Every structure is written in C-alpha cells, then in structure tokens.
Amino acid sequence: THLLVDVGISGKKTVEGLNGLGLTGNDIDGILITHEHSDHINGLGVMCRKFGIPVYGTKGTISAIREVSNLGKLDDSLFHVIRADEKFILKDITVNPMKISHDAAEPVAYRFQYGGRRMAVATDLGIYDEYTVESLKCMDALLLEANHDINMLQVGPYPYYLKQRILGNRGHLSNELSGKLLSRLLHDNL
C-alpha cells in the first residue's frame, strides 16, 4: 500500500519524487489531505486527473478544496469524506485522523497502523493540548512540525499580520513548543 499525505508540490515534482523511489502515480492507493492550504494541495489536481487517485479529507477540507479555482476540474467521485477520530482502512493500513488547531476549514493530522507498528504525521499545529499528547503517544515513528524560532520570526522580514498568524493558536508550532511536545511523547521505541 502506498499513500501520500498531502500533495503540496506540483504534480510534475510529485511524479519525479515518486519515480526516484521506483514508483509511479499509478502505484498510489490514496492521497490523504490534512487541510486545504495551497502548500498542501498544489499538485492535487494533476495527480487526480492523471492517475485517478482517491482523495481523503474531512468535509470542511473537501468543501474548501472544491472552491480552489487553480486546481482545475476535479472528479467528485474521487473524493471521500473522513472524520477526525474515526478510523478507516485503506487496503492493509488503518488510518486514524485526529483534530488539530490550524487556520483551515477542518484540519487533521494522520495516525497510521500497519503490522503492529504505528506512525503519525502531525504538521501545521498551532498549539497542542492533552488530546494531542494522548493521540500521539505510543508511536513508533513521528513526523512532527517544528516551524520556527520565535525570536528569528519576530525580527525577520515577514509582515506583522503573517507573524501574528504563525505565532497564533491556529498557526504553527515553534521549535520550542515542538520540543516540549516531543519530550512528552518520547519513549524507547520512538
């Protein structure tokens, strides 16, 4: 089973990356979308049209994607609505989406289970709470956002509104907060 979490780069670059792994778009069994921001869906239209890959996302995310005009024509039959904290199975992988705090329609992170092993992909978190900690405990592998150094962001070139968005509870985890979260999740098998 081969799954993609988001398709933020162009369809062409996605295909090139897959080819580098010895795969093609035809090998992909599903695309799991975390949220509708362009850096997570740029290549979605191309991948759907060229390869007919099923797409999974929350109702809010899929509705927001349908409003994005630069993705081109999308086949509605490829889209499947999922819900946070409701497991589903794609071939031999159990997928369990979890709610996250981000400035998008209905964003999620994804937890996976295969052959007794667990992993999670958790990016674009504005904050974390006990739900997040409990949801990410006991993973064997974890891809976790560590987005910025607070001081560097504050003195950097971004406009004020963007700095506030990134620093907000629905923005992105700072390196420090990511480290604190990771320290609560660490165990011998991670």
Question: Where are the model-predicted features located?
Answer:
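Conserved beta-strand hairpin/beta-sheet module of binuclear metal-dependent hydrolase folds
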Residues: 1-21, 108-124, 141
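Active-site neighborhood of phospho(di)ester-bond hydrolases with catalytic His/Asp-centered motifs
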Residues: 5-8, 29-36, 55-59, 120-123, ...
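Active-site metal-binding motif and surrounding structural segment of the metallo-beta-lactamase
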Residues: 11-57
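Short, conserved loop/helix-junction motifs that constitute active-site signature segments
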Residues: 23-26, 47-51, 73, 135-138, ...
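Active-site environment of divalent metal-dependent phosphoester hydrolases
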Residues: 37-40, 62-64, 105, 127-130, ...
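Metallo-beta-lactamase
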Residues: 59-109, 113-116
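Active-site glycine- and acidic-residue-rich loops that bind
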Residues: 121-133
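Cap/insert and terminal regions of metallo-dependent hydrolase folds
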Residues: 130-190
